[in-house]
Amino acid sequence: MRLNTLSPADGSKHAPKRVGRGIGSGLGKTGGRGHKGQKSRSGGGVRRGFEGGQMPLYRRLPKFGFTSRKAMVTAEVRLSDFAAVEGDIIDLNALKAANIVGTQIEFAKVILSGEINRAVTVRGLRVTKGAHAAIEAAGGKIEE
């Protein structure tokens, strides 16, 4: 077997449609577009969501909600993520250094997910009740 002898399996590739190459091809003259109308023209067609002039669904329905700016700079941290952090004191900078949260994050909340098996001091992070109990059960403490 050589590179110049490789070819795709029979039937796995289709030849492209050759449009506008005579009556006998079945795709001559109008090229499968029919006669006249917007869709027969070059660049013809309607935009996504267009309903022929009827008020489209995306404009009939009301707008609602918003994107919280605070949510963009807040992260949830699992207890199991603490294993990747070196040192006994865990704060926002330690989480950023361990690549657990991004550099834009300003607030983090520790949630009860996974296990913690070493005593750590959590400083300056929000902590859920369940995570609070798990950290203290492992011999750690939480500082505000």
Curated annotation (Swiss-Prot):
Coiled-coil residues: none
Gene3D superfamilies: 3.100.10.10
Keywords: Ribonucleoprotein, Ribosomal protein, RNA-binding, rRNA-binding
Segments of this protein annotated with the region Disordered: 1-53
Cellular component terms per the entry's GO annotation: cytosolic large ribosomal subunit
GO-annotated biological processes: translation
Entry annotated with the keyword Iron-sulfur: no
Biased composition, class Gly residues, residue ranges: 21-31
GO molecular function, one term: rRNA binding
Key word RNA-binding present: yes
Pfam families the record matches: Ribosomal_L27A
Signal peptide as annotated in the record: none
InterPro entries: Ribosomal_uL15 (IPR030878), Ribosomal_uL15/eL18 (IPR021131), Ribosomal_uL15/eL18_sf (IPR036227), Ribosomal_uL15_bac-type (IPR005749), Ribosomal_uL15_CS (IPR001196)
Biological role stated in the UniProt entry: Binds to the 23S rRNA.
Membership in a protein family: Belongs to the universal ribosomal protein uL15 family.
Subunit note: Part of the 50S ribosomal subunit.
HAMAP family: Ribosomal_uL15
Designated name of the protein: Large ribosomal subunit protein uL15
